[in-house]
Amino acid sequence: MQVAYHWQVISRLLIALLRVYKLVISPLLGPRCRFAPSCSDYAMTAIGRFGPLRGSWLAARRLGRCHPFHPGGFDPVPDAPASPSPSSSCSCKGPHP
C-alpha cells in the first residue's frame, strides 16, 4: 500500500511540473509541437494513465519523434490494457467461483 502511495505522489509531482511548464515556459516559446495533443498534454495523460515510469517512457519516446523530419499529426496516448478476467488466464475446464 505504501509503495502505491509513493508512485501516486511521484505522478502528481511530474504532472504539476508539466503544468508549470505549460503556464510559464510554453507561452514564451510559442506553439512548436507537431502533434495533437501537444507533447506536454500527451505526457500528462500518459503519466496519469500508466504511472510515472511507463508514462515518462512514453512521453520521452514522443519527444524523440517531435522534430522537423517527422510529419506529426494526431498521436494519442495508447489505451491502458484491460485487466484480464480470472477465467481468461485459467486453462482449467471447470467453473470458477
From Swiss-Prot:
Keywords: Cell inner membrane, Cell membrane, Membrane. One of its GO terms (cellular component) is plasma membrane. Signal peptide: none annotated. The keyword Cell inner membrane applies. Pfam families: YidD. It is found in: Cell inner membrane. Residues 77-97 are annotated as: Disordered. This is Putative membrane protein insertion efficiency factor. Could be involved in insertion of integral membrane proteins into the membrane. Residues 85-97 have a biased composition (Low complexity). The keyword Cell membrane applies. It is a peripheral membrane protein. Belongs to the UPF0161 family. PANTHER family: MEMBRANE PROTEIN INSERTION EFFICIENCY FACTOR-RELATED (PTHR33383:SF1).
